């Protein structure tokens, strides 16, 4: 190779990936390769060290920026305009509200939000954080009503603190949302997913059985992360040697939604662009080579795209959404299930005596933990909650985690009771944006819990657990436990 030639770009599944937080591997941050690849800036290989591969796909990166850049620019504009409008109009409109310093971005709050939720729930129905310029709803009835009022509270400007838009199902309003949801619904319905139950049950047996042979062990890396990764990639049709790359790149790609006006926000944005390009190349390769089987969810959606009912962009974003939603939140549900049963050994005994309570116990665990802690909406017009009026154009945080522990809705909400059967909990959201993967998540959770109840008598935490500091998610990055096998009577 001459000095003027560039080596070929590495295959999509061989690039350096950001660490997988669920598996306990560190995120090593933004490397030079990530930055130059994402921004299209060529680098040179250092002959003495093997060096960093030269970025030779500038046109691809430019195309990625042209495709998603306008949405990011729009998000930045919305963020600035929203802050200005809220400060101007909201300054005189915050009667019947309470100021709060509750900030889900605070690592201390993210690690243990429940004392702060109790403060929110004891206060006014609407609370305002001036630092984040966000209005917070925490009571169950208010959160549920807001989630269902999609005419007044929009998802199209983003559902996180970083206002932005990409053609995701969660960040769309009717009629676009209705059309996309209609395409997805048949593949994620309970009847369609039943065909995957034997695979899910067998996977749960393997993973819990493996835990019994290597105790003590980290349940995040041995059970909680592998279970949803292998299940969702099989259901979607991207299983096999690429499954880990799909999951990790999906989590990297969604960083494009973090358009915070800060250095860390810019780094996340660059990482997101890099992840999107690599993930799309991997996805396109599988689709073009007939590797999306017709019996899978993405295989069916690909057929819809060929028939013109979905655009290529929408098909790709469905893949990203389902991988991220079906992997990370379910992994958090499973990892925290072990912690809950360790903290409540009497409930594990109860389940062993009454295994018919397993479905109810999973619903109670979802209420108790709420893997998705909050989500945001933007008011289209002034929105009234009691006597308080939230101005049009304002960011509103719906605190799922607090609502699911509202004593007005649930007796002794800070206690896990396997026989509670908390009908109507908000762990999966509510209204038209109810999580489309609820049936698969329940199937996985119940399969794991059945294996725990049948084979494990006691769970003991042997090291302090490590919690994610994600502002929107509640889950563990490490949980080392020792398990005592159940002895057959």
UniProtKB/Swiss-Prot annotation:
GO annotation terms (biological process): cholesterol catabolic process
Domain of life, per lineage: Bacteria
PROSITE patterns xref list: CYTOCHROME_P450
Top EC class, one word: oxidoreductase
Sequence positions that bind heme: 435
Chief subcellular location: cytoplasm
GO MF terms held by the record: cholest-4-en-3-one 26-monooxygenase activity; heme binding; iron ion binding; steroid hydroxylase activity
Required co-factors: heme
Catalytic activity field: beta-dihydromenaquinone-9 + 2 reduced [2Fe-2S]-[ferredoxin] + O2 + 2 H(+) = omega-hydroxy-beta-dihydromenaquinone-9 + 2 oxidized [2Fe-2S]-[ferredoxin] + H2O
Assigned EC number: 1.14.15.27
Localization: Cytoplasm
Pfam family, one: p450
Gene3D superfamilies, per the entry: Cytochrome P450 (1.10.630.10)
Result of knocking out the encoding gene: Deletion mutant does not synthesize SMK and shows a hypervirulent phenotype in the mouse model of infection. Loss of the gene does not affect levels of menaquinone-9 (MK-9), an essential component in the electron-transport chain in M.tuberculosis.
Entry keyword set: Cytoplasm, Heme, Iron, Metal-binding, Monooxygenase, Oxidoreductase
One GO CC term, this protein: cytoplasm
Function, in words: Involved in the biosynthesis of sulfomenaquinone (SMK, initially named S881 on the basis of its mass), which is localized in the outer envelope of M.tuberculosis and negatively regulates its virulence. Catalyzes the hydroxylation of beta-dihydromenaquinone-9, leading to the formation of omega-hydroxy-beta-dihydromenaquinone-9.
Similarity field: Belongs to the cytochrome P450 family.
Name of the featured protein: Beta-dihydromenaquinone-9 omega-hydroxylase
Gene field: cyp128
């Amino acid at each position: 190779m001459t000095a003027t030639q560039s080596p070929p770009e590495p295959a999509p599944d061989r690039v350096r990936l950001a660490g997988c937080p669920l598996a306990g591997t560190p995120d090593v941050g933004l490397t030079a390769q990530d930055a130059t690849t994402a921004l299209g800036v060529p680098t040179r290989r250092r002959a003495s060290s093997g060096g960093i591969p030269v970025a030779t796909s500038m046109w691809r990166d430019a195309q990625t920026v042209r495709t998603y850049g306008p949405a990011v620019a729009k998000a930045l504009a919305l963020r600035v305009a929203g802050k200005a409008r809220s400060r101007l109009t909201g300054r005189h409109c915050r009667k019947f509200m309470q100021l709060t310093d509750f900030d889900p971005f605070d690592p201390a709050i993210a690690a243990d939000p429940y004392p702060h939720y109790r403060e929110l729930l004891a206060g006014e129905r609407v609370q305002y954080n001036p630092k984040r310029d966000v209005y917070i709803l925490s009571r169950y009835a208010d959160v549920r009503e807001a989630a269902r009022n999609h005419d007044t509270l929009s998802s199209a400007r983003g559902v996180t603190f970083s206002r932005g838009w990409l053609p995701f199902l969660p960040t769309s309003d009717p009629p676009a949302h209705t059309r996309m949801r209609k395409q997805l619904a048949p593949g994620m319905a309970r009847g369609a997913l039943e065909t995957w139950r034997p695979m899910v049950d067998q996977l749960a047996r393997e993973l819990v059985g493996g835990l019994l042979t290597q105790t003590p062990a980290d349940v995040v890396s041995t059970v909680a992360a592998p279970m949803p990764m292998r299940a969702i990639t099989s259901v979607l049709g991207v299983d096999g040697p690429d499954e880990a790359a799909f999951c990790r790149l999906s989590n990297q790609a969604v960083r494009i939604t973090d358009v915070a006006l800060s250095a860390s926000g810019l780094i996340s944005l660059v990482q997101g662009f890099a992840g999107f390009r690599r993930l799309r190349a991997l996805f396109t390769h599988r689709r073009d080579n007939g590797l999306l089987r017709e019996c899978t969810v993405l295989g069916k959606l690909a057929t819809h795209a060929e028939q013109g009912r979905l655009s290529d962009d929408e098909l790709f974003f469905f893949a990203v959404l389902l991988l991220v939603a079906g992997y990370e939140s379910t992994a958090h549900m499973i990892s925290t299930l072990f912690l809950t049963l360790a903290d409540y050994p009497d409930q594990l005994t109860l389940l062993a005596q009454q295994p018919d309570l397993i479905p109810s116990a999973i619903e109670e665990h979802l209420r108790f933990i709420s893997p998705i802690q909050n989500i945001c909406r933007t008011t289209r017009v002034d929105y009234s909650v009691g006597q308080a009026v939230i101005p049009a154009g304002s960011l509103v945080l719906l605190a799922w985690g607090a609502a699911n522990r509202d004593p007005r809705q649930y007796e002794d909400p800070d206690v896990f009771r396997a026989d509670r059967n908390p009908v109507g909990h908000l762990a999966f959201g509510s209204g038209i944006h109810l999580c489309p993967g609820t049936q698969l998540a329940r199937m996985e959770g119940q399969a794991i819990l059945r294996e725990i109840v049948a084979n494990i008598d006691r769970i003991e935490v042997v090291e302090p657990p490590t919690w994610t500091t994600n502002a929107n998610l509640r889950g563990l990055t490490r949980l080392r436990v020792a398990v005592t096998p159940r002895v057959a009577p």
